[in-house]
Swiss-Prot record:
A GO BP entry: glycolytic process
Cofactor (UniProt): Mn(2+)
Pathway: Carbohydrate degradation; glycolysis; pyruvate from D-glyceraldehyde 3-phosphate: step 3/5
Stated family: Belongs to the BPG-independent phosphoglycerate mutase family.
Protein name (record): 2,3-bisphosphoglycerate-independent phosphoglycerate mutase
Catalytic residues, chain numbering: 74
Catalytic activity: (2R)-2-phosphoglycerate = (2R)-3-phosphoglycerate
EC number: 5.4.2.12
Residues holding Mn(2+) 2: 24, 74, 449-450
A single GO cellular-component term on record: cytosol
Name of the gene encoding the protein in the UniProt record: gpmI
Naturally occurring in which organism (per UniProt): Parasynechococcus marenigrum (strain WH8102)
Domain of life where this protein originates: Bacteria
């Protein structure tokens, strides 16, 4: 277990907490076919939906600073929730730069080009070759290839990581074809390796996976395949191995060597962090590296503070976030999740800041060590609930944020039976949390960061492992000691809201002033037809 807290924290005694419960990947879709949420056993959520103020809110596209019709994701969702405003996300920021042909005006890339123009080293472009838009975008890679040609960089090796998680499970060839076409048009570059994201993009310190990817990129003794990408993928599919799990394979003799440069074009940091650490840290100790070439590493965005890398698109600072407002009011807050979502309720929700805020305590519950989460659909939800109930019972935290990873992580496997079990587990845990909150007279705001588990099969009959653009539920369970001034229980939630409105809603419940920079609006509005009975008497909830 990992517990940490900020220094200089205030202390409340006997606090009625406000508990933000984020159901990661719990979207709304009316059709029950291929819908793990509709088919799962959810008596608690169904009862809450009918008894308390609720709404469907938006968690994708322009509502969270992404292009229209772009599915939301956990990083963007938690950042938007914490910021209380719509932020131009990195996908849009980088896409605009590529579209406007402005990569050559990016200082880190200018320096990189000058270095390679004066040296014999190779530029290695490493990242997820995908049009999913969650961690990267293939258009960015194609733009980099054209930029390299225009900058006079002669030797370019592309190390393509295949997706199959944020895209259909057998769709890699479409993106690879786009990259091959870009290299032909630019007259520079070749495909040096292929590797499924399962190996190259682990974020849970499963170093045996990362080691396989690292060896692929750096070990000169590894054999080179004489098959084309099309042949390799067809052979993989025939063996039941989809894009996400594609085994690492070298396609040329271009490995990373002393004096080479590496540009990691994933813009989302959480799944780029481990492979970047292996490439740039002298004191890396996750596994024993067979070779340690001296590389000049550039990342598209800040992967981690204090890494010895250049950053092409440095973070744009954010102020007056939810956590900051709570901390500045002298209130204590508690953030908890299991390993897979821990960075989201901490780092991402705090606007990319690693260190806890004053009065912020963090608690990490380890995720189970399994190959894929369909093998353990309950994940660590029960242990996570236990720890959160302990925090509620302490009576010292004004704001508690908890993330349940199951709908998203099990939804990504595409295994329907496992996903319905995951949904039932989370529903049961919500009931347990609700009892604890009710004992304290607190309030729960239940929502999700994006959709996933409500769609488990695509129109082509393949397992649907990606997120969705569906709206997500938001339910306000108001407690006796957190009644809103002037409203009592006579409230409802707006139907036109989005994730940017969650923080203003929480601040209203906490009776804290919303800062001007937080441009979202509280979802709460007065109405006269809500059951006025207290939380403890509203309905018997199954646990």
């Amino acid at each position: 277990m990992d517990q940490s807290s900020g220094k200089g924290s205030g202390r409340d005694v006997g606090v009625a907490p406000v508990v933000l419960t984020i159901l990661d990947g719990w979207g709304h879709r009316n059709d029950s076919e291929h819908n793990a949420i509709r088919q799962g056993d959810t008596p608690v959520m169904e009862a809450l939906w009918h008894a308390y103020p609720h709404a469907l809110i938006q968690a994708s596209g322009s509502h969270v600073g992404l292009p229209d019709h772009q599915m939301g994701n956990s990083e963007v969702g938690h950042l938007t929730i914490g910021a209380g405003r719509i932020i131009r996300q990195e996908l849009v920021r980088i896409s605009d730069t590529v579209r406007d042909d402005q990569l050559n005006n990016t200082p880190a890339l200018v320096e990189l080009a000058e270095h390679l123009q004066n040296d014999t080293g190779t530029l290695h472009l490493l990242g997820l070759c995908s049009d999913g838009g969650v961690h990267s975008h293939v258009n960015h890679l194609c733009g980099l290839i054209h930029w390299a040609a225009a900058a006079g960089i002669k030797k370019v090796a592309v190390h393509a990581i295949t997706d199959g998680r944020d895209t259909p499970t057998q769709s890699a060839m479409g993106s690879i074809t786009l990259v091959q076409r870009a290299m032909e048009e630019a007259g520079v570059g070749h495909l040096a390796s292929l590797c499924g994201r399962y190996w190259a993009m682990d974020r849970d310190k499963r170093w045996d996976r990362t080691e396989k990817a690292y060896d692929l990129y750096t070990d000169p003794t590894r054999s080179i395949s004489d098959q084309s990408p099309q042949q390799l993928l067809a052979e993989s599919y025939a063996a039941g191995i989809t894009d996400e799990f594609l085994k690492p394979v070298r396609l040329s003799d271009d490995v990373m060597q002393d004096g080479d440069s590496v540009l990691v074009f994933n813009f989302r940091p959480d799944r780029a962090r481990q492979i970047v650490q292996t490439l740039c840290l002298d004191d890396f100790d996750g596994f024993e590296r067979r070779t340690t070439p001296k590389l000049d590493v550039v990342t598209f965005t800040q992967v981690e503070q204090d890494l010895p890398v250049s950053v092409a698109f440095p973070p744009e600072p954010l102020d007056d976030l939810l956590g900051q407002v709570v901390a500045e009011a002298g209130l204590r807050q508690y953030r908890t999740a299991e390993t897979e979502k821990y960075p989201h309720v901490t780092y991402f929700m705090n606007g990319g800041i690693e260190q806890p805020l004053p009065g912020e305590e963090r608690h990490l519950v380890p995720s189970p060590r399994v190959a894929t989460y369909d093998l353990s659909p309950a994940m660590s939800a029960d242990q996570l609930t236990d720890s959160c109930i302990d925090a509620i019972d302490q009576g010292t935290y004004s704001l508690i944020v908890i993330n349940y990873a199951n709908p998203d992580m099990v939804g990504h496997t595409g295994v329907m039976d496992a996903a319905t079990e995951a949904i039932a587990t989370v529903d049961r845990c919500i009931g347990r949390l609700l009892d604890a909150v009710g004992r304290r007279g607190g309030t729960m705001l239940i929502t999700a960061d994006h959709g996933n588990a409500e769609l488990m099969q695509g129109p082509d009959g393949q397992a649907w492992t990606a997120h969705t653009t569906n709206p997500v539920p938001c339910i306000l369970v108001e407690g006796e000691q957190r009644k809103l001034p002037g409203h009592g229980n006579d409230i409802s939630l707006r139907e036109d809201g989005g994730l940017a409105d969650i923080a203003p809603t929480l601040l209203q419940i906490l009776n804290l002033e919303q800062p001007a920079a937080m441009t979202g609006r509280s979802l709460i509005e007065p109405v006269s037809n809500v059951d006025p009975s207290p939380l403890s008497a509203r309905l018997p909830l199954p646990v």
